[in-house]
Amino acid sequence: TDDGRQVLDGVAGLWCVNAGHARPKIVQAIAAQAQEMDYAPPFQMAHPKAFELAERVAALAPAGLNKVFFTNSGSESVETALKIALAYHRARGEGQRTRLIGRERGYHGVNFGGISVGGLVANRKAFGPLLGGVDHLRHTHDAARNVFSVGQPLHGAELADDLERLCALHDPSTIAAVIVEPVAGSTGV
């Protein structure tokens, strides 16, 4: 701080400053990049650096997954993924695949689709009716039964099969996408 006190940032701007604030090496890297390319429109054209990064990302993905689509945020990523899922099924002649499945207490951003598949009750209530055709898997956190578990928990098989329950309920041929956080961030960390 200005008066010499040290403060621990326990929020870290929703995890976007996990390396700390104003780290000289990071500030210098950002400044150097901004001098070379501060913005490259992604529509029907790009910058060689964007293609280079896309190739590096694709090389990390499993075989056959070689397409990269850059977004500005997790919210935009979720919204784009949902649209890609719907468009994919329509292109395959499976236009009935419109149902989206999220998880209770899941957080998938601030956009309309992300809030719809997200399972944060307060967020969903604040906006009233959202996207139709969305259902949610039960959340796996059970504080009473998850206290300091070591190894495989003694419960949870019913949660592992929850997607099968929803498939039976809705008909799997109507499901376009399932989106879950492998580790709950906003509601579980």
What do these predicted regions represent?
Residues 1-5:
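Residue-level recognition of short loop/turn positions
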Residues 6-95, 101:
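Glycine-rich loop-to-alpha-helix module at the N-terminal edge of alpha/beta enzyme cores
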Residues 13, 74, 106, 183-185:
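Short glycine-rich anion-binding loops that position phosphate/pyrophosphate groups of nucleotides
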Residues 56-177:
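PLP-dependent aspartate aminotransferase-fold enzymes
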Residues 179-189:
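Conserved PLP phosphate-binding loop immediately N-terminal to the Schiff-base lysine helix
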